A protein has these predicted regions:
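Cysteine-centered catalytic environments shared across enzyme families
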Residues: 1-290, 302, 306, 506-507, ...
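A conserved catalytic-core signature of glycosyltransferases
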Residues: 11-12, 124, 196, 295-300, ...
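Adenosyl-5′-phosphate
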Residues: 31, 112, 142-148, 165, ...
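Active-site adenylate/phosphate-handling loop in enzymes that bind or generate adenylated species
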Residues: 82, 304-364, 397, 450, ...
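Conserved short loop/turn motifs at secondary-structure junctions
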Residues: 219-220, 246-247, 323, 468-469, ...
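DNA-processing P-loop NTPase/helicase core
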Residues: 367-368, 380
Length: 590
């Protein structure tokens, strides 16, 4: 869209939720153009004209990737939303003799340009093996970067002529928000905090419910999605459309909990029980959906619930972000507790303990766990957890311990031929988080990396793949900033995370419908790889094929594959990383 003055041109992907407020502010200041319509795009353009780039970005609330061309100054500005809900790729490419600066919210668009070289960056493959995704600012292609969340990048005409890439500029920083919040914590009472969070979430959800197309929500029956749906229903005169999927496999089905919450809130609920064959049929579509290799296997149920929702609605709200903001992941407590116990033990003794754990396979530990009194959900996947713990007993600090828990392949450069693992916010270029304790640092790093590069990527690509727009109310920056001001006692109390968020939810949903062990959104990839997916995986992991392609060390991959097939170890996550790269690379040949 071209601005009313004709000076600026905007290419925009996303939504500005407070555009009516910006529209009114422009009117009040006498800086509004002669409006041609009522869109957020036109309002955003007018805001750029009136307030400039940085002030407009600071005022806007939404999810977006945008490019703004200033015809007068001949500058190009790229910008991305605060938390990274929408992707933005950019970089110089030269195939043949013609260099070009390329940018877009999809790699598919860049690949269509004649100057696009398409050379795989082996450093990015190393990152994939550690994190199951390629974190910003890296991409799978050499010379192409992702703009960091909360940043903008301005290229002058001189930059474009000299083929330079200036550094990007932050207009909002989650790390700074975290440090400032911990330094000046909330001073109110518990009841005041409950009321404040309720009001903030209501407003964020209310703004994101504004749509001229059918709207609904994903509902798993967990704390986060149930809170979103409860506050949607509280503001709606009609039943909210909610969606969930279920699996018949024990330990993987949350649909029964979602239905109980939906029945209580009286939503218009749709559920689909997915057969293994239906879930497995999604796998060939994943490389196209995700643009670059992406190996979080919960991408499968995420796509399926998006596909289900799209049959009824065009926009769906999700509960992503609650774990990182309100201390929801079990690993936060587990890592801190484990370090408190292990930190005082001599390193040789810890290594002996690890060796003892590894004497039994995860399957054998699970069999023993089922014989313990009160087994049930308390010891689900105990073997995998023990082996994960054994793998990090050599940690020399709580930071090393955290890295061990969030890593798949511990030394990716030894698996990727000619690969060198570059630093990330987790492994080297850590942000300044002074004043935060160990648990708070893990929460901040998760929000900066795992949430931005895994969770939000998973949801955005899966939903956009079926033309469904996903919105994430927890990531309204006002909610994020308030969450970081909350003392840890309002997040973690009596050994339970999300204390404050639970209190908000209990105003709408009885606690007996919510209180249960955290389950996650997973599929039984480990069993599928030994069963119906075995031939597909064997083809992609064929030793001669790996040797010919020259990306992965065949011996390292085949060892994991053989141990997995035998049941000796569960290497599903490690193998899924390699398989998703292989499937993606195969798709690029077509």
């Amino acid at each position: 869209m071209v601005s009313a003055s004709g000076r600026r041109v905007l290419v925009f992907n996303g939504e500005i939720y407070n555009f009516t407020e910006l529209h009114a502010e422009l009117e009040q200041q006498g800086r509004a153009p002669a409006w041609r319509g009522h869109s957020d795009t036109e309002t955003l353009l007018a805001a750029f004209e009136a307030w400039g780039v940085e002030q407009t970005l600071k005022r806007a609330r939404g999810m977006f990737a945008l490019a703004l061309w200033d015809r007068q100054n001949r500058t190009l500005t790229l910008a991305r939303d605060r938390l990274g809900e929408k992707p933005l790729y950019y970089g110089w490419q030269m195939q043949g003799q013609q260099p070009a600066f390329l940018f877009g919210s999809e790699l598919k668009a860049l690949r269509e340009h004649p100057s696009f070289a398409g050379e795989v960056d082996r450093s990015a493959v190393c990152l994939l093996l550690r994190h199951n995704c390629v974190p910003a600012p890296y991409s799978i292609y050499r010379g192409i970067s992702k703009l960091m969340p909360g940043h903008y990048l301005t290229l002058t005409e001189a930059d474009l002529q000299a083929q330079r890439l200036p550094a990007s500029t932050p207009y909002w920083s989650l790390a700074e928000v975290a440090v400032a919040g911990v330094a000046a914590p909330w001073q109110g009472s518990d009841d005041q905090a409950i009321r404040e969070l309720d009001a903030l979430l209501r407003d964020a959800i209310g703004q994101q419910m504004v749509a001229d197309v059918p709207l609904g929500a994903f509902l798993s029956g967990g704390i986060d999605s149930s809170t979103i749906v409860a506050l949607m229903q509280a503001q709606s005169s009609k039943p909210v459309k909610t969606f969930s999927i279920g699996f018949d496999e024990a330990g993987y089905n949350e649909a029964v909990y979602a239905k109980a919450v939906a029945d209580h809130l009286k939503t218009e609920h749709t559920e689909l029980y997915v057969k293994p064959a239906q879930a497995q049929a999604v796998i060939p579509r994943l490389p196209t959906l995700y643009d670059e290799p992406f190996a979080d296997s919960s991408q499968i149920p995420t796509f399926l619930v998006s596909e289900l929702a799209r049959k009824s609605v065009t926009v769906s709200l999700s509960g992503d972000g609650g774990d990182e903001l309100f201390c929801g992941y079990n690993r936060y407590q587990m890592t801190a507790q484990l370090w408190n116990r292990l930190g005082s033990l001599p390193l040789p003794l810890r290594r002996m303990l690890a060796g003892g754990i590894n004497l039994l396979s995860p399957t054998q530990w699970n069999q023993l766990a089922r014989k313990l009194p009160g087994a049930g959900s308390r010891y689900v996947n105990l073997g995998e957890k023990l082996h994960k713990g054994a793998g990090v007993m050599g940690a020399r600090s709580i930071e090393d311990l955290y890295l061990g828990f969030v890593s798949h392949w511990p030394d990716p450069a030894s698996v990727v031929i000619d690969g060198r693992e570059p630093p990330t916010l987790v492994t080297g270029n850590r942000p300044d988080l002074r004043g935060l304790d160990g648990v708070q640092q893990m929460m901040a790093l998760d929000a900066l990396t795992y949430m931005a590069d895994d969770i939000l990527v998973k949801v955005d690509r899966a939903s956009m793949g079926v033309s469904l727009e996903s919105r994430v109310p927890f990531l309204d920056h006002r909610v994020v900033e308030f969450a970081w001001r909350l003392p840890q006692s309002l997040k973690l109390r009596n050994g339970q995370g999300k204390w404050l968020l639970r209190q908000v939810l209990y105003q709408y949903v009885p606690r007996q419908l919510i209180e249960r062990p955290k389950q996650g959104f997973a599929v039984p990839i480990d069993a599928w790889l030994r069963g119906p997916l075995r031939d597909w995986a064997e083809s992609l992991l064929d030793e001669s094929r790996l040797r010919q392609e020259g990306i992965f060390q065949p011996a390292a991959v085949r060892q994991k594959w053989n141990e997995h097939l035998s049941g000796k170890r569960n290497w599903q996550h490690w193998l899924w990383d390699v398989l998703m790269y292989q499937a993606w690379a195969e798709g690029q040949k077509k």
